[in-house]
Amino acid sequence: MYCPFCQHGHSRVIDSRVIEAGSAIRRRRECSQCQGRFTTIEKAVLLVLKRNGVTEPFSREKVVTGVRRACQGRDVSDDSLKRLAQQVEETVRSSGSSQVRANDIGLAILDPLRELDEVAYLRFASVYKSFESADDFEKEIRLMRRQSREKQVQQG
């Protein structure tokens, strides 16, 4: 790590802390030449493999933007969308892989979105699962109701 003050190539770590829900490390460093102190943030890169074969860095903002469309006209706050995006990132990072398929991100969005707003969930699922008719919506609603009943029985 080069010192931002004197460009010397050696520094020592004084302090390290996990930040951003474990997805990054903040390190306080001291230059061994000029004793200047500076902070670095180290983050493991998570790449998204898109359907066309292109890879790009994971973006929470893209998750928020996609889910915001499904939530249009619904009473869902920006903070809720940001928390959902963080939850999705934590889910896909927990796979332990540095690369995740775009399809897996969509899958990771479904459950937290359903908990947040069922109408937004149906809108998102209709695109993600390529609904073609009202029957597809009806099947999904029946599935949601069954899962809701099962959850109530478990909490019982």
UniProtKB/Swiss-Prot annotation:
ZnF (unnamed) intervals: 3-34
Key words of the record: ATP-binding, DNA-binding, Metal-binding, Nucleotide-binding, Repressor, Transcription, Transcription regulation, Zinc, Zinc-finger
Pfam families: ATP-cone, Zn_ribbon_NrdR
Free-text cofactor note: Binds 1 zinc ion.
Superkingdom of origin: Bacteria
GO biological process terms on file: negative regulation of DNA-templated transcription
Cofactors, names only: Zn(2+)
Record-annotated ATP-cone domain positions: 46-136
GO MF: ATP binding; DNA binding; zinc ion binding
Protein family per UniProt: Belongs to the NrdR family.
Free-text function comment from the UniProt entry: Negatively regulates transcription of bacterial ribonucleotide reductase nrd genes and operons by binding to NrdR-boxes.
Protein name (Swiss-Prot/TrEMBL): Transcriptional repressor NrdR
Gene source species: Corynebacterium efficiens (strain DSM 44549 / YS-314 / AJ 12310 / JCM 11189 / NBRC 100395)
Gene name of this polypeptide: nrdR
